[in-house]
Amino acid sequence: MTEKELKKFTIGLIESKEKLNENYIRYSYYELKVKNNLSEEEIDEVLKISRNYFENKAYSVYFTNAEFEYKNAKRKVETNEYMIAFKE
């Protein structure tokens, strides 16, 4: 995937996730690695762009194995998840 195609993919992914649930965003291993066949470098770039986007919109952003609290419950970004972002 070219750099331009990857940015277009990332913007589309962000928009679709926000439409699904604007308060809780989840990127899974399956959707990035299996379904869209992204390389590790492409996944890193998608996560970097997404992190910047969501942090600029006041989301809390967490990556694989990170622990966090959401709706008064302790949670963890599981190994089959790349990223979780949310705002309360």
What function would you assign to each model-found segment?
Residues G12, S16, L20, K35, ...:
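Surface-exposed polar/charged interaction patches
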Residues M1-E3, I25-E31, N80:
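N-terminal export/targeting and maturation segments
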Residues K19-E40:
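Short glycine-rich, basic-tinged beta-strand/loop micro-motifs
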Residues S39-F63:
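Charge-enriched amphipathic alpha-helical scaffolds
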Residues A66-E88:
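C-terminal edge-of-domain segments
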Residues M1-L13:
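Short alpha-helical segments that sit at the start of domains
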